Curated annotation (Swiss-Prot):
Record's subunit section: Component of the Pelota-HBS1L complex, also named Dom34-Hbs1 complex, composed of PELO and HBS1L.
Subcellular compartments: Cytoplasm
Descriptive protein name: Protein pelota homolog
InterPro entries: eFR1_2_sf (IPR042226), eRF1_1_Pelota (IPR005140), eRF1_2 (IPR005141), eRF1_3 (IPR005142), Pelota/DOM34_N (IPR038069), Ribosomal_eL30-like_sf (IPR029064), Transl-rel_pelota (IPR004405)
Function comment: Component of the Pelota-HBS1L complex, a complex that recognizes stalled ribosomes and triggers the No-Go Decay (NGD) pathway. In the Pelota-HBS1L complex, PELO recognizes ribosomes stalled at the 3' end of an mRNA and engages stalled ribosomes by destabilizing mRNA in the mRNA channel. Following mRNA extraction from stalled ribosomes by the SKI complex, the Pelota-HBS1L complex promotes recruitment of ABCE1, which drives the disassembly of stalled ribosomes, followed by degradation of damaged mRNAs as part of the NGD pathway.
Amino acid sequence: MKLIRKDIEKDNAGQVTLIPEEAEDMWHTYNLLHVGDSLQASTIRKVQTESSTGSVGSNRVRTTLTICVETIDFDSQACQLRVKGINIQENQYVKMGAYHTIELEPNRKFTLAKKQWDSIVLERIEQACDPAFSADVAAVVMQEGLAHICLVTPSMTLLRAKIETSIPRKRRGNCTQHEKALEKFYEQVMQGILRHINFDVVKVVLVASPGFVREQFCEFLFLRAVKQDLKILLENRGKFLQVHSSSGRKYSLTEVLCDPAVTARLSDTKAACEIKALGDFYKMLQHEPDRAFYGIKQVEKANEALAVDTLLVTDELFRHQDVPTRTRYVRLVDSVKDNGGTVRIFSSLHVSGEQLNQLTGVAAILRFPVADLSDEESSSDED
């Protein structure tokens, strides 16, 4: 993401102009937008024209519109973002008050104005515009006949390919059909890696499986690379890291990212920090349950007692349509930071964020136990 201009007043009203440069930037943009914001961008509008003879025709024109945002639609797989609202500035093609849908596109600037820019949104802009926050992890989670090729970015887990094929069982004295099907499967996975992994960006490729599937696949992969002179694979052989997983399904990526060998390799990435924080929370919940709580009421009470050491919260909560609810979570984050705590904001499109959402989307590791908090947990109504 490229920041072109930032004009925010002391009362936190103002506007920013940004250019999304890659697919993940569309996800960041989705998280910046809220109903009631003002969005200005270049867009296509179908307009009717009347010729001198009186015949009416229509054509598509590119124009710049400013709309008041009413609905926001994001396709996470295609990374497409469509924003619908009413036109609030005079335009030669579109009447004031007319509805229009702007499709935001990579490499095309937009200006976003808000009456109130909160700390969460401003921090997201800062991170999105920081080159250090880039996608640098790929993962192949596999078992015989099933593989998922994913890109793990700081903000999301993107499924790039799912390969599924039937592998006949081994038969006593005749393994030919099994071996042929397995080789064909490995070939499909190899082609998926070549098609979907950009080795100029990716620093590590995790190959995970139960049993010996990962070893057998990597042996096949690099023998085939030598045979076919696939230099892209041979030159990046050192980036491949084999790890255990319980299955070849996408959800197994969570356990893969918790593997000590993986966390050591990915120690500087935001994704690794989130995985570690969630792992620490589960350990605390198991061994010292009076220092690990989830749910907004419990966490707020712990924060009032200055007990929150680490706050875990999903970005989905900051997209809440109800402004007071959204503000409540922003205040919690700001307060924890002011009290010296650490805040980890999880992406709801990341496997760790999906898990945290199952725990209400907000959790905390405490510095010390808080009296009466455990008693309230069982009777608390979550908002």
